[in-house]
Amino acid sequence: MRLHTGEKPYHCTHCERQFVQVANLRRHLRVHTGERPYACELCTSK
């Protein structure tokens, strides 16, 4: 229902972004932390 009501209860503590789902907030937080959890299968890059 949040999609229809516009409610965004999850807020980023580093900027003004707000999110409907906590998973989207967690993904966004990587912008601020620099975390890159997925490695390339062919080389050492992330």
UniProtKB/Swiss-Prot annotation:
Location of this chain's protein in the cell: Nucleus
Record key words, sorted: Developmental protein, DNA-binding, Gap protein, Metal-binding, Nucleus, Repeat, Zinc, Zinc-finger
Claim: DNA-binding is one of the keywords in the record: yes
Transmembrane regions: none
SUPFAM superfamilies: beta-beta-alpha zinc fingers
Recorded family membership: Belongs to the krueppel C2H2-type zinc-finger protein family.
Protein name: Protein krueppel
The organism of origin for this protein: Lithobius forficatus
Taxonomic lineage from the root: Eukaryota, Metazoa, Ecdysozoa, Arthropoda, Myriapoda
